[in-house]
Amino acid sequence: MFKLLGLTLLMAMVVLGRPEPPVNSYLPPSDSYGAPGQSGPGGRPSDSYGAPGGGNGGRPSDSYGAPGQGQGQGQGQGGYAGKPSDTYGAPGGGNGNGGRPSSSYGAPGGGNGGRPSDTYGAPGGGNGGRPSDTYGAPGGGGNGNGGRPSSSYGAPGQGQGNGNGGRSSSSYGAPGGGNGGRPSDTYGAPGGGNGGRPSDTYGAPGGGNNGGRPSSSYGAPGGGNGGRPSDTYGAPGGGNGNGSGGRPSSSYGAPGQGQGGFGGRPSDSYGAPGQNQKPSDSYGAPGSGNGNGGRPSSSYGAPGSGPGGRPSDSYGPPASGSGAGGAGGSGPGGADYDNDEPAKYEFNYQVEDAPSGLSFGHSEMRDGDFTTGQYNVLLPDGRKQIVEYEADQQGYRPQIRYEGDANDGSGPSGPGGPGGQNLGADGYSSGRPGNGNGNGNGGYSGGRPGGQDLGPSGYSGGRPGGQDLGAGGYSNGKPGGQDLGPGGYSGGRPGGQDLGRDGYSGGRPGGQDLGASGYSNGRPGGNGNGGSDGGRVIIGGRVIGGQDGGDQGYSGGRPGGQDLGRDGYSSGRPGGRPGGNGQDSQDGQGYSSGRPGQGGRNGFGPGGQNGDNDGSGYRY
């Protein structure tokens, strides 16, 4: 009996240990109080209190919420047609391909095709759903092929796929990385679209690659390869080379680093493409592009190192161009302006200046490598030198000839002097530097700076300021009077009438002298009547003024007194009577037989202080 009782208890425990099947496996979900916790592939969530927790196809609640993590065929994680709640929310992360997100409170978290909420949000990563027009845009949708972003609040965050035509929000933002959607016209542009049209107002695609038109107001695509840059604010940042016709901004900027564009027109006002296209005519030039013919700026710069661009007409040439199309490049195909035509020219000139006596000229004719010419010059001696030459690749071959006869003098004849008439005849003679008539014969002779000269020898027969009739060098003339003497610097005096015969004799600076010897027979300030001396000087008397009758040079006369000695600077003293203390009168030796202050015989010896004495005085 106990065995039977134990078996009964064991069976009861087995029966009690088996769980009952859930109610929602047999009954439809409640429309009033709740939703099944783990609804299956078709249950409808409650319209009042909630939604199925993870149903695979059930319709979420229109009032209280949406399925949390559905995985099936409805609207949850993998729902394909379920409609999200219009009031309280949207599926959290469903992959539905057509479900409509809530138009009031939210949007599906990651649906792949559902239409985002028109009021509160957009699917987080939908691939084609239309983003919210009011509150947001899909967060990171991937492959949406036509969804329209929100026109009010935002744009898809990080679209990564191949959207080819969706229109971005026209109010608040643009798709983050759409590849073809049209960016917002108001607030932004796609981050990296490949062809969509950027915003005309606030921005441009960040790195579009294939041709989208950038904003004409605020920006340009960051790295587009051919899109048209903004006409107002900017240009593509760093396009990589395939834009073949995009027009950069004409106001504010140019593409930053385009590397292969072959025809885009850069900005005419503010900048130029960084690497390639036609540079700006106003502000800059491409930095270091590889363009094959772009024209650099004619105002501000030249391409940095483009291998063929035509250099600037105003500021400089390309830094190191070596390409195949620009003017000046070293490659084949460009107009490099080589001098491949033979040179051909002809010129001639002749200069004649009669007042200065200049006469010269040159003529030349060239045809290819062969040159002929002639130049001529009037030489100082009156002849004309003519050089005729030929030049070619074999060298320079001159032939020299002369015309006319050379003058006899050593210099050109002049028509007159500074202030008088000259009659000389030789080089730098028969003329004077100024405006007189010169007929003299000797070098710088026969003429004078300021008067009439008739003498024949060099710097003789003339005087600076009077009439001269003498014949010797710097004789027969005086600076300021009439001279009749025949010797060099004799027969004349600077300021009076002189009748002496020898050099610097027979004349005196300021009076009448009748002596015949050098610096004798005359005195600086008195009357000299001695024979060979005939004048008074500092010797042979006393220097106090008077008449001198000495007969030797610089003796027999004194500057200011009466001297009776005979020898030069002897037999007299500068300041006393002959015969006194310090006076020598014994042997007529110049400045000898005594000294100025004592009675010795040998004094200064047989020679004078300032000249050569041979016993006959201060002769020289």
Swiss-Prot record:
Note the biotech application. Its strong elasticity suggests that it may be used for industrial and pharmaceutical applications. Recombinant protein can be cast into a rubber-like biomaterial by rapid photochemical cross-linking. The resilience (recovery after deformation) of cross-linked recombinant resilin exceeds that of unfilled synthetic polybutadiene, a high resilience rubber.
Signal sequence span is 1-17
Compositional bias segments (type: Low complexity): 310-321, 423-432, 583-595, 611-620
In its keyword annotation, does this UniProt entry include Signal?
A: yes
Gene Ontology terms: cellular component: chitin-based extracellular matrix; extracellular matrix; extracellular region; protein-carbohydrate complex
Name the Gene Ontology molecular function terms of this record.
chitin binding; extracellular matrix constituent conferring elasticity; structural constituent of chitin-based larval cuticle; structural constituent of cuticle
Q: Where are the Elastic repeats?
A: 42-56, 57-77, 78-97, 98-112, 113-127, 128-145, 146-164, 165-179, 180-194, 195-210, 211-225, 226-244, 245-262, 263-276, 277-292, 293-307, 308-324
* GO BP term (any one): chitin-based cuticle development
Could you tell me which residue ranges the Chitin-binding type R&R domain spans? 342-415
The segment annotated Disordered runs over 22-376, 390-620
What are the protein's UniProt keywords?
A: Cuticle, Repeat, Signal
Descriptive protein name: Pro-resilin
Q: Which organism is it from?
A: Drosophila melanogaster
Please name the taxonomic classification of the source.
Eukaryota, Metazoa, Ecdysozoa, Arthropoda, Hexapoda
